[in-house]
Amino acid sequence: MSSQPRFIHLRTHTDFSMIDSIVKVKPLVKACAANEMVAMGLTDFTNFCGVVSFYSEMLSSGMKPIIGADVKVKSPLCGDEYFDLTLLAKNNEGYRNITLLLSKAYQRGYNDLPYIDQDWLIEHRDGVIILSGGTQGDVGKKLLKENVAEIESAVAFYQEFFADHFYLALSRTGRPNEERYIQAALKLAERCDLPLVATNDVMFLNTEDFEAHEIRVAIHDGYTLDDPKRPKCYTSQQYFRSEEDMCKLFADIPSALENTLLIAQRCSVTLRLGQYFLPQFPTGDLSTEDFLVQKSKEGLEERLVFLFPDEKVRLEKRPKYDERLQVELDVINQMGFPGYFLIVMEFIQWSKDNDIPVGPGRGSGAGSLVAYALKITDLDPLEFDLLFERFLNPERVSMPDFDVDFCMDGRDRVIEHVAETYGRGAVSQIITFGTMAAKAVIRDVGRVLGHPYGFVDRISKLIPPDPGMTLAKAFETEPQLQTAYDSDEEVRALINMARKLEGVTRNAGKHAGGVVISPTLITDFAPLYCDNEGLHPVTHFDKNDVEYAGLVKFDFLGLRTLTIIKWALDIINVRMVREGKPRVDIAAIPLDDPESFELLKRSETTAVFQLESRGMKDLIKRLQPDCFEDIIALVALFRPGPLQSGMVDNFIDRKHGREEVSYPDAEYQHASLKPILEPTYGIILYQEQVMQIAQVLAGYTLGGADLLRRAMGKKKPEEMAKQRLVFKEGAEKNGIDGELSMKIFDLVEKFAGYGFNKSHSAAYALVSYQTLWLKTHFPAEFMAAVMTSEMDNTDKIVGLYDECLRMGLKVTPPDINIGKHHFSVNEQGEIVYGIGAIKGVGEGPIEALVAARNEGGIFKDLFDLCARVDLKKINRRTFESLIMSGAFDKLGPHRAALSKNLEDALRASDQHAKDEAMGQTDMFGVLTETHEDVENAYANTPPYTEKQILDGERETLGLYLSSHPVSRYLKELSHYTSTRLKDLAPNRRGQISTVAGLVVASRIAMTKKGNRLGIATLDDRSGRLDLTLFGESLEQFGEKLQKDTVIVASGQVSFDDFSGGLKMTVRELMTLDEARSRYVKSLAISLSEHQITPSFIKQFKALLEPVSGGTLPINVYYQSPKGRALLRLGVQWSIIPTDEILTELVNLLGESAVELEFE
């Protein structure tokens, strides 16, 4: 290493620039260290997103971090044209000023790129050093235009306001006009006494990364690499050059090199990291600590009265609660976190006071009795052995972290309340970054390289869709990917390039729940990033960096299930009030309701929170949970680790007495562990049990036991060796055999890897139980709420509708006279379809209809509705959707009459409005159509056929409500099939099932091997089944998989691991016509003597003649007063039994007179 540094990189970008760099912070810092540089500047484009990690990494590597940003600027001199500047923080004042400039750039809104006004630099100039932006700066652009007056004017600004803090930036990277600019800049520097500084505008680390960088930029800009129109703004020379390279490059301008060192010496920013700063919570005359104690004791008293209404029992229980409360309060106050608990208490209490449901807890916070006393959580931690130290460990100082679930509808109101309470400038949400994930980066790189879609799609589909999937993992799990990589040079080139870009930051977004509350302005800690309209501010620092920078994060999460519970209770309590019954309080329901557990044991858990998947239902069937502890266990057991380890089987066998319960193992157990492991039948299932075992067996404090639990999770050999020794010595002190303690230690270590946080499991089990209880006791109201939550997802609505039918609930079509935007329940206990779930009907039209109904009462008919509603808010197509969905059924005799008269009703309403405007309405100001007028308008319109009605419902609702296309065939289909879909079960080997139903979905897919695969979904109104057709079956029957046709399918039924349901591999498939040809013996027609007239015979003959010549004979059953006779029509009248002819015969003779006869 040379004794004296000769150059410092002052201008580098990382991938946080999100437009023009592929460098991560850590590799950048490593490159700086490898080149033996003593300092480096980070100047990402208009953001400080990488500052905290950059600052920390540089200091820990023994180098000086220089913090800055590249910005776009506008000034009157340059008109609408942007120019570039680099802002460097000379000191903490400069850092704060750049923070404010970046925040203002986002907060005022922007079209393409955020920018600052040059005038802002005057107000925020203290402590800021400016590099001129080279050829793209205002001075550089004027130099290249050679306009002397404008050059002088541009320079004058910086000479006045940044006298010795402005440098002319030079770079030699092979970009256009650089050398011409440098020669002009040298003359200007001499003439105006301006210092020069050398930069290399670093965008990547090595020259070989240039192509990857260009692809990154093309992905952002939407070009392909070979597009002649693609802007080429960068060169292969913008890499991290060594000091030696830079010194050679600027050997002719030594002052430009020296000034990099001078600037580095001038810049010194100190960030306060690792400290926490909370806003002051108002506590009156009391200290924060004393106020927390007071509130906690008051809250605990309320809780104890609720938990133990009997005063004698309460006195017995009180000591252990008081003791636990005092322990927790001491720890919270000693660690300096009383304000945190009070802040969370306040916004949760505000939410409850304002009818915004809050979850009972989430994560380890449910283990705190103080949180329970303050009503932050709603689960008694002592009852369920939940540990405070799992949440806040006095032996490992870290911030407490309450994740709070709110009703989806109210979450934003809570954040708004917090902003009003602490000041809008002190509250912000947190940024999160989207990265180029494995599957997407293959697609993006393939597109930019110009590969055909099919080629890229094939490679992308070889990457499993699992969350967190990487290219490296994909190669491990998908052999075909490795084969394609090895055998195809184009595939190899694509993947190699994708590897360079995988994980690179793609975009910025808003963290799902993170909110920070600052004691002062947020911008005292971090800049603010906003959307294009300058709204929805988020910090430039992500959730980890923002906490490291001193701001405390609060997680405001939206949980849809809480919204469902609220909606259900709203419907329920309207009914309870109407019936004079007490309102339902979901927080007060018993946790041992027998009916709820019976429903649970039957696995009827569709729509029950966390318990509705096929895999979970199978686990429930095996476990047969009969107490709340079992539901807690279910949540913890249904994870890959326990399921794959055999732990689940042991748990179930022990519960049902098929395996001996031991604590924890038949060979190695100890009586002291029984109280800890009894709720889980001796299985170590929870992290809290690991901690309690260490405490009871080996004398650990619970704080120390939490550290042991963490160590076991990390599996570091050196740390585990130390812990084994501590565990053994502690056990021996407790009189427990050392060898036995080590055997138990090994078991604990094994299961610690699978252990789940019981606090989280218990809190979420409570939400699961609440939905289970609602489904059990208020099924219609609960299902109406669940369906409301899925109004935008037709597939989900279809599944939930099927569940309603299974439950014996009736779902009626939407009804404009009683319906609401949401699904609701009428006084007969029927679910009324939500008007908001009708396709093509937005909130505006619904609001207009409901407003008219609220103002004038229910609508008498279509003309009345059109007269009273604001037609400017509802177009014709919306009216048609409402009619075809059934929402207007009570406004006329049938849907066809309503459709036919819609135009007249709209015209009459329009004319009425014009007359009203001219003062020509009748004295009551309403339409003058009489009842007779309306009846006449509706007359002589034949109703729609059942098919037309059902097609309309499917089009507007996504499902069939009034009937089902398959309903008319159910009796017939029973002759072709072995079972209904709802009763279907997997076949034994060699066994075949035959089913029938309506094809509701059908497509052809490709397998990973490139083979065609037919996939269809069959619906017989009792359930649904996925069909798959391979090879010969697909070739032979594939064309029959037409959507909305009825088919009969035979094949092997098995479990589908992907969907969790059943699937059939089809062996044979018939259309309905083919099934009739095979199974139907004859067509029976019943006639009476009154029907047989010359005109009837003529009509009957006209119907049969076009379809005669088939194979199905016709038997006519003639009924007269003297008796019933069978007349077999001649073979020439045998027909093809199509739907069309059967429908026409039914229309002519009546449904009971036409019947298919089977053997």
From Swiss-Prot:
Gene3D superfamilies: 1.10.150.870, Bacterial DNA polymerase III alpha subunit, thumb domain, Metal-dependent hydrolases, Nucleic acid-binding proteins. Transmembrane segments: none annotated. SMART domains: POLIIIAc. One of its GO terms (molecular function) is DNA-directed DNA polymerase activity. Pfam families: DNA_pol3_alpha (PF07733), DNA_pol3_finger (PF17657), DNA_pol_IIIA_C (PF20914), HHH_6 (PF14579), PHP (PF02811), tRNA_anti-codon (PF01336). Keywords: Cytoplasm, DNA replication, DNA-directed DNA polymerase, Nucleotidyltransferase, Transferase. PANTHER family: DNA POLYMERASE III SUBUNIT ALPHA (PTHR32294:SF0). The keyword Heme does not apply. GO terms for cellular component: cytoplasm. Its main location: cytoplasm. GO terms for biological process: DNA replication. InterPro entries: DNA_pol3_alpha_NTPase_dom, DNA_pol3_alpha_thumb_dom, DNA_pol3_finger, DNA_pol_IIIA_C, DnaE2/DnaE/PolC, DNAPol_HHH, NA-bd_OB-fold, NA-bd_OB_tRNA. Its EC number is 2.7.7.7. It is an enzyme of class 2 (transferase). It comes from Haemophilus influenzae (strain ATCC 51907 / DSM 11121 / KW20 / Rd). The gene is dnaE. This is DNA polymerase III subunit alpha.
